[in-house]
Regions:
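N-terminal positively charged helical leader segments and presequences
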Residues: 1-71, 123
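RNA substrate-binding interface of SAM-dependent RNA methyltransferases
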Residues: 72-167
């Protein structure tokens, strides 16, 4: 099954839709999908769409929606991970990828007293998140928070009045 990420996905059964040029090219040229092949789409907010390709065009691949599932694989709890960025950005990218694949709901980066890295390329992290979401066939994209101070992060977490587990490595 091939999953495509479309953040503005608000389709219903029986409707037609077209992928953007980048996703269409990937669908037809790279994955070599053809008409009548089944694909899945998600908006990253729980909507999961099963569709059949109706027009395999490199510039605008069209499909017909067969089934729509809202709140697909929704859980009744939330996993929020806060981490200080490491000096090696590859490790942070790997962490984000694995967190998305595992189904983390929220990722926060914080700066501590001895943090080695204070700059995070948000656009790069978001691309990695989209890639991991598609690879793991998840329907929920984690919320990526802005960088915060460690003490502010803990203070805000205590205001939520929920069970919190802290793990320091």
């Amino acid at each position: 099954m091939h999953l495509f990420y479309t953040p503005d996905l608000e389709l219903n059964k029986g409707e037609y839709y077209s992928l953007n040029k980048e996703e269409s090219t990937h669908c037809i040229k790279v994955l070599r999908l053809r008409e009548k092949d089944t694909i899945c789409l998600t908006n990253g907010k729980g909507r999961f769409v099963f569709a059949e390709i109706s027009d395999a065009n490199l510039k605008s691949c069209s499909f017909l929606v067969n089934e729509v599932k809202d709140e697909y694989e929704k859980r009744n709890y939330c996993i929020h991970i806060a981490v200080a960025p490491t000096q090696n950005m590859n490790r942070m990218e790997w962490f984000v990828e694995k967190a998305v694949e595992m189904g983390v709901d929220k990722i926060s980066f914080f700066v501590g007293e001895h943090s080695e890295r204070t700059i995070i390329k948000r656009e790069r992290i978001e691309k990695i998140m989209v890639s991991a979401l598609k690879q793991s066939l998840k329907s929920y994209m984690p919320q990526l928070d802005e960088k915060a101070n460690f003490y502010d992060l803990v203070k805000n977490a205590k205001k939520l009045h929920v069970k919190i587990n802290y793990i320091c490595l």
